[in-house]
Regions:
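Basic nucleic-acid-binding interfaces
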Residues: 1-139
């Protein structure tokens, strides 16, 4: 058995630069593949990812030697680096992010929420979504 163990699940959210709706369906698919590859290369356990035109959601599990801010910096920085020189696929991220801890008992619910982003955003803006999530996580 390893000397250290963690079961730290985090729901991450960040937006595109200036919340521009640049993530078209085809580009979104490419971005998610790139993010998945970055996560794999950096030993970041990415459980699921989805989003809409102006922001993304990820569910990750942190290892004992990982910090949320470092994981986000790695994924955002490397994905921007990958796309920065291609004007047809340019993606830039807004500074900052939101991170919410997820208990193991709520993983299924959070996965469903992430997978159903398109449906959630038919009637709700990103700002309203973030307010609702913040409100639901208050004790």
């Amino acid at each position: 058995m390893p000397a250290s163990y963690s079961s730290l699940w985090v729901h991450l959210i960040w937006s595109t630069k200036n919340r521009e709706p640049v993530l078209t369906p085809s580009l979104k698919h490419e971005v998610f593949i790139v993010i998945n590859n970055i996560a794999t290369d950096h030993e970041i356990y990415l459980d699921c990812i989805n989003g809409v035109a102006d922001h993304v959601h990820l569910l990750i599990r942190l290892l004992t030697d990982q910090a949320v801010a470092d994981v986000v910096k790695t994924i955002k920085g490397n994905s921007w680096e990958f796309f920065k020189n291609d004007p047809d696929r340019y993606v830039s991220w807004q500074d900052g992010f939101a991170a919410f801890s997820v208990s193991p008992g709520n993983l299924k619910q959070v996965r469903s929420y992430i997978y159903n982003q398109e449906r959630h955003h038919k009637d709700k803006s990103f700002s309203d979504e973030l307010k609702d999530i913040k409100q639901s996580t208050k004790s």
